[in-house]
Amino acid sequence: MKRISILGLAVCGAVSLWAAETDTGGLDVVQVRPNFYMIAGAGGNIAVQIGSDGVVLVNSGAAAATDQVSAAIKKLTSLPIRYVIDANADADFVGGNEKIAKTGFTIFTNALGNAGVAGTMTNGGAASILAHQSILNRMSARDAKPSYPGDAWPTEAFLQNRKALRMNDEGIEILYQPAAHSDADSFVLFRRSDVVVAGDVMDMTRFPIIDLANGGSIQGEIDALNKLIDLTIAPTPYIYKDVGTYVIPGHGRLSEQMEVVDYRDMVVLVRDVVADLIKQDKTLDQIKAARPALPYETRFGTQPGVTNSFIEAIYKSLTAKK
């Protein structure tokens, strides 16, 4: 294998960026921990945990990148994919569910010989797709855009705010975050690896996309970011020796607690400025013209329309009738 340099993805020397000698299909594979990787460039960021039980993925990426994702995982390990955990319902996170799951193998091997339960309990012998019920609701809706085949839907859905399992000698928690980026967001915490997969609650490439039409809200976004901060630990007191909890955002580079704090503070500050302008009876157009996110536009507002979308989402969220 050879080491490659990818600008902006490594946050410190403890993170290695590796590519196999053969082509990685344009994807960036970041070694986060000895048995933990992040795959970037396939839509939303994908987390890969590897151990004796097999492979656990968080997110499957965009449908168009499925073959490249499968190839990248095979270069990391020959072990089968056992679980695909969905962190949200957006197409760039769940688009690869069907094909990726079918490259894996169920953990419920005792049911494979029973035709009455094999199709549901074992996902037809494929890897299980695990997600909060809100994600299943979004993906299976008649008017879902894009529409998803049934084999892409979660095969195990849970209603409670917390789902826990143990794979590869590690506790894994899936923590539902209501009304944040949307109504279908979850954090996935890997306890021993000390990694949190945040989905699009945190996006290091732009202002957060708050999907009001699908249940998102500015207060829910802030609440979720506060929860994310609580889940992370800074590398104190040995800040020059160790690293703290790693956070895999929905898009962009690997992060740590301080970057989550900065992102939360940015969201709160812009929210507060918009709220103050609303109190002054400013219209949405007037608020946009005032550029309340100006201090952060060069960092998070370079994509077309993203700043106005963020301001509009804050305005509509704050002025919505209770």
Where are these regions (language model features)?
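Bacterial N-terminal signal peptides
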Residues: 5-16
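Metallo-beta-lactamase
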Residues: 21, 26, 31, 54-56, 60-64, 116-180, ...
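Active-site metal-binding motif and surrounding structural segment of the metallo-beta-lactamase
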Residues: 52-56, 64-115, 125-127
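Intrinsically disordered, low-complexity Ser/Thr- and acidic-rich flexible linkers and loops
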Residues: 106-123, 234-242
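Accessory terminal helices/loops
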Residues: 14-20, 106, 236-244, 253-322
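Conserved beta-strand hairpin/beta-sheet module of binuclear metal-dependent hydrolase folds
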Residues: 27-74, 186-199
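Divalent metal-coordination and catalytic microenvironments
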Residues: 35, 49, 59, 73, ...
